[in-house]
Amino acid sequence: MNKRDFLKNSAKIAAATSLSFSGIRAVQAQAHQGYQVLNPPVNTRASDKVEVLEYFWFGCPHCFAFEPSINKWADEKPDYVDFVREAPPLNPGWEPHSRAFYAAEIMGVTDKFFDPMFDGIHVERRSLRQPDKIAKFAGELGIDEDKFRKTMDSFAVNTRMKQAMQMAQASRIRGVPSVVINGKYLTGGSLAGSHDGIIRVINERVAEEYALL
């Protein structure tokens, strides 16, 4: 190798090293700010709104503890923000609760079912792990028990669970609660440090995304 080639190769290595360190610094900066950039971004439901998507599990105590913060935020959010939830069965033991969430969604009874299900598990300490017990619980809430049981085991619920898992994998969801802002930014307790930190990240990223609509 002559001197000219050596210098050219050295320059390329230096440039590549610089880019590598720049990438590391960018990731570190994102983590310090409480979020991670999703690259590539994940598709959202509507292009004319900023989507905020929470991933959760009914059996998760951290999700239950986060509910007052995210509910307060949802009550006060601007009209241009679309808030949605997904309950993918990231662990096989989560499946009955995922089925319950999507059954309630498909039957149009989420408002009747969502908060009582959380309270039943975490406040009343009820054992709501088996489909039959969950369906019976739904019946106590004035929901058609038999229909709820059948819907939990339906093709429609299977499809929604599969979609939720695909979305979670694309969004690099490893635990809950996790929040994805407009398919581009991932945050959660481990990244933002606290419930208030998660809400701060949501508000900052929403404002930035709204400016791009």
Regions found by a protein language model. Give the residues of each.
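C-terminal cap of thioredoxin/glutaredoxin-like
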Residues: 5, 140-213
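Extracytoplasmic/secreted proteins, especially bacterial periplasmic and envelope-associated proteins
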Residues: 51-54, 65, 69-72, 95-99, ...
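Structural microenvironment flanking redox-active thiols in thiol-disulfide oxidoreductases
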Residues: 76-107, 111-138
